[in-house]
């Protein structure tokens, strides 16, 4: 329906205002419409009203097939918006539950891009700052939605994390959350929050690790760095990663995010 309307109207530009789903829909509509009739350059301006997906600065879009219970990720440079406008006033009234879900979406984006095997200095720097902001301001934004300083910080963190994973990519938390959300209609950020502690344990193998630092998996050092950014530490890297898992679960409990899908 969106593609049909687009081709009928033939706009000079598309303004996508909303959360990740609205922005992704606009991206996909423009993409497929111009494949049918490429009548010229059509700009896309993305204005996010949640602090979560970072879709305003990525070359990704996710399309949800509600009948088949499947989410399809689309990836193409042509999906990237031409301009992104960040205004934290647009997230002032976001309810606490959505603030929690989208905030953990930001954190997961930053964490997964940071530990990605495709990371580089630029993506890592962006991810580190987003992680630092989440550690300080996510709970503040959840507890007091009128705290505009926290809102602004989380809005920026969402964009930073989007820029990071657009370069470095994401991990299995993201892909599993797509299918979990599509099948059980769980908000994407909430699904990722529920999965993330288990994925960190799996990727770092902290439940089976030898105490010999020589045998640590590469992900252990990266996860330990994340823990340090959050102000967490312990007497060795494995225990430091364990403190990161505990911090994620603490945030879930503080923001009333379920620990399981039951």
Descriptions of predicted regions:
Residues 100-160, 164:
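C-terminal and late-domain segments of enzyme folds
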Residues 118-126, 141-153, 168-173, 213, ...:
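Flexible, glycine/charged-enriched surface loops at secondary-structure junctions
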Residues 21-28, 53-57, 173:
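Short glycine/serine/threonine-rich phosphate/pyrophosphate-binding segments
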Residues 31-121, 206, 218-225:
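A glycine/threonine-rich phosphate-anchoring loop and its flanking beta-alpha core
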Residues 52, 159-192:
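Glycine-rich phosphate/pyrophosphate-binding beta-alpha loops
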Residues 1-38, 139-151:
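N-terminal small/polar loop signature for handling phosphorylated ligands or for N-terminal nucleophile
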Residues 186, 190-262:
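Gly/Pro-rich interdomain helix-loop hinge
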């Amino acid at each position: 329906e969106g593609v049909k309307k687009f081709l009928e109207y033939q706009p000079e530009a598309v303004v996508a205002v909303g959360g990740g789903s609205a922005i992704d829909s606009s991206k996909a509509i423009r993409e497929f419409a111009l494949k049918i009739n490429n009548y010229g350059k059509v700009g896309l301006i993305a204005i996010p009203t949640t602090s979560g997906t970072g879709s305003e600065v990525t070359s990704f879009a996710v399309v949800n097939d509600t009948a088949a219970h499947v989410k399809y990720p689309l990836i193409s440079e042509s999906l990237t918006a031409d301009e992104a406008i960040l205004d934290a006033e647009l997230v002032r009234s976001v309810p606490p539950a959505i603030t929690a879900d989208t905030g953990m979406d930001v954190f997961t984006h930053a964490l997964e891009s940071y530990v990605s095997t495709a990371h580089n200095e630029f993506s890592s720097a962006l991810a580190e700052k987003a992680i630092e902001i989440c550690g300080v301001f996510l709970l503040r934004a959840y507890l007091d939605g009128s705290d505009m300083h926290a809102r602004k910080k989380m809005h920026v963190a969402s964009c930073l994390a989007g820029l990071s994973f657009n370069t470095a990519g994401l991990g299995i938390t993201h892909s599993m959350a797509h299918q979990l959300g599509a099948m059980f209609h769980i908000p994407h950020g909430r699904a990722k929050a529920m999965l993330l502690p288990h994925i960190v344990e799996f990727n770092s193998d902290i439940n089976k690790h030898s105490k010999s630092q020589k045998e640590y998996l590469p992900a252990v050092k990266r996860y330990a760095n994340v823990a340090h950014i959050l102000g967490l530490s312990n007497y060795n890297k494995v225990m430091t990663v364990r403190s990161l898992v505990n911090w994620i679960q603490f945030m879930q409990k503080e923001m009333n995010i379920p620990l399981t899908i039951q």
